[in-house]
Amino acid sequence: AHELLAQKDKVAAYVEDGGSLLAICGSYQLLGRSYYMGEDRIEGLGVIAAETVRGSDRLIGNVAVKTDLAPEPFVGFENHGGRTLLDADATPLGTSVVTGTGNNGDDGFEGLIYKGVIGTYLHGPALPKNPELADWLIAHALKRRDDAQATALLPLKPLNDTYEHAAHDAAMKLLP
């Protein structure tokens, strides 16, 4: 954690400049202000509007969440002991948990979107099962680059996502 905190200013500058970043589970938690483990507080990078508190048990299982980034729910597998609490002005990645627990099991949200950052508990693997998530990150990086070569690639041309959609559909079938 000390090595990461030493990079706090660099990470914050990258994020504030619109850099693209996918943070899953522990890295998502550490982008927030802090992680509380009982009475102990671990300082986070403070680049996203969130805090995490360790729960008494782990939240484990398949998860699906509605998101504004795709017509179908994003799917994954969650396995986390932390309960992430977003600030009131934060934008969740998952606006409604369909199955699973999401950030904390209480508020119905999963993950967070801030500038070019996606923070999430969607393991398993998130990008191949949710091609729109990969597309969002790529498009965001190209927009940030903002030169003729990058601009020529926007909007992204549709790819053959047959295998990705098959992986997504297989994950959906695992849901209770």
Predicted regions and their residues:
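Cysteine-nucleophile active-site neighborhood
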Residues: A1-P71
